[in-house]
């Protein structure tokens, strides 16, 4: 069994994310940072890196970073990346898993909320995959009341593929969404930043669409 699979089945990790769920339910978080979310991130990380022909060790390490990256959200979103780093560092040391380049995993966890300037492909893939997990089922009832954030409740799916040196991202939306409000929201700008940083690192041209139509504002943001 791979280390990633062992971690996913570890009761300590599963219980940790139950703590995250309980905290977010009690404190009315806007989006879930639960096990379902980190598993979504791990799947997207694997898809992207495999399509770019990265080696199995890097893919495994990126998935480990993905599954541990929100373990610090049990005390809220603020500073959760650093708390997740501290938890992951202690956890991996205690488990004594034979992991190569463990520091790169830990660094990716520590910077996943904000650092778009890193040169680490592992970290950039985590950051992008994390930011793209904004589908409707991740948005809480409280989050559906918040201006800007509420627009993500209309995201039915996000399709990502790499084709002919292009990174193609298709947002499939319900018709009720407000494009202006979506574009002005701070987190949408973070999504654009993540797409830009990742694309530049792997020499891909990003192309974003909403319901099969080119997302014009995203093009202007990314090109500038």
Regions found by a protein language model. Name each.
Residues 1-80:
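Acidic/His-rich, divalent-metal-binding segments that scaffold phosphate/diphosphate chemistry
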Residues 50-162:
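Divalent metal-dependent catalytic cores for phosphoryl transfer on phosphate-bearing substrates
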């Amino acid at each position: 069994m791979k280390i990633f699979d062992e971690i996913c089945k570890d009761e300590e990790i599963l219980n940790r994310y139950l703590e995250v769920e309980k905290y977010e339910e009690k404190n009315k978080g806007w989006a879930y940072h639960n096990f379902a979310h980190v598993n979504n991130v791990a799947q997207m990380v694997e898809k992207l890196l495999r399509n770019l022909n990265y080696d199995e060790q890097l893919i495994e390490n990126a998935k480990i970073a993905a599954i541990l990256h929100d373990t610090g959200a049990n005390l809220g979103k603020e500073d959760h990346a650093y708390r997740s780093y501290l938890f992951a560092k202690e956890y991996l040391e205690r488990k004594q898993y034979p992991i190569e380049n463990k520091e790169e995993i830990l660094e990716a966890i520590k910077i996943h909320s904000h650092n778009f300037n890193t040169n680490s492909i592992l970290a950039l893939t985590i950051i992008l995959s994390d930011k793209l997990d904004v589908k409707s089922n991740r948005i809480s009832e409280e989050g559906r009341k918040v201006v800007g954030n509420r627009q993500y409740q209309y995201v039915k799916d996000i399709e990502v593929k790499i084709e002919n040196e292009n990174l193609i991202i298709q947002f499939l939306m319900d018709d009720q969404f407000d494009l202006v409000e979506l574009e002005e929201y701070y987190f949408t700008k973070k999504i654009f930043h993540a797409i830009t940083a990742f694309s530049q690192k792997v020499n891909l041209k990003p192309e974003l669409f909403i319901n099969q139509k080119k997302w014009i504002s995203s093009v202007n943001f990314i090109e500038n």
